């Protein structure tokens, strides 16, 4: 299923090729620029480069201790040491609670462990801090679809598409899930944070 593979790659955040650097003060400006370019890009190679650059910005960590925890958690996920990666990302969240990608990485580890409630909580924390996180929205959509919450899955995938219109197969997946029916809930994402989904 190409769409699920695409979402999984997004959810994992290109961990295999990630290059964690010290965060610059211009990170937010850089992300704004990258997202603007992603909206208008048409060349597949440019799209892939922009997506990778966005992920790299998300995983940038400002100091050595936090960077070491991020790298260790990513390495543990790559080695399928998922419980250890949860512990590592929990430590990172404790010392850097505003770091959206720490929440997203822990959400991914929880998802891989099959702990959907914990993953959902961390995804909601991710999008509270980074409302453009198309990887988190893709993961949220996959979990909601798996749980049979089709309208919430649609809402999540639509937000993923809003911030990254190049996700392969997302239009077909949204159409498929809309055909499954269901009433749209008051809280479409199920996150309850007012800032989520901007």
Predicted regions and their residues:
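N-terminal leader/linker segments that initiate helical-solenoid repeat arrays
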Residues: 20-71
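Terminal, low-structured helical/coil segments at or just beyond the last alpha-helical repeat
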Residues: 49, 56, 60, 159-198
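Register position in tetratricopeptide repeats
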Residues: 78, 112, 146-147, 179-183
């Amino acid at each position: 299923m190409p769409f699920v593979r695409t979402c999984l790659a997004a959810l994992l955040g290109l961990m295999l090729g990630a290059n964690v650097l010290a965060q610059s003060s211009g990170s937010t400006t850089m992300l704004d620029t990258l997202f603007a370019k992603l909206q208008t890009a048409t060349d597949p190679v440019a799209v892939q480069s922009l997506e990778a650059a966005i992920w790299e910005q998300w995983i940038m960590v400002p100091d050595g201790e936090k960077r070491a925890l991020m790298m260790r958690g990513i390495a543990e996920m790559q080695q399928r040491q998922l419980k250890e990666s949860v512990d590592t990302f929990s430590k990172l969240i404790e010392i850097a609670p505003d770091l959206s990608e720490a929440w997203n990485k822990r959400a991914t580890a929880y998802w891989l462990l099959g702990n959907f409630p914990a993953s959902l909580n961390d995804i909601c924390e991710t999008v509270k801090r980074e409302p453009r996180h198309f990887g988190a929205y893709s993961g949220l959509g996959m979990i909601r679809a798996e749980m049979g919450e089709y309208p919430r899955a649609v809402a999540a995938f639509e937000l993923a598409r809003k911030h990254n219109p190049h996700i392969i197969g997302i239009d077909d997946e949204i159409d498929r899930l809309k055909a499954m029916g269901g009433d749209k809930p008051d809280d479409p994402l199920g996150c309850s944070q007012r800032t989520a989904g901007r």
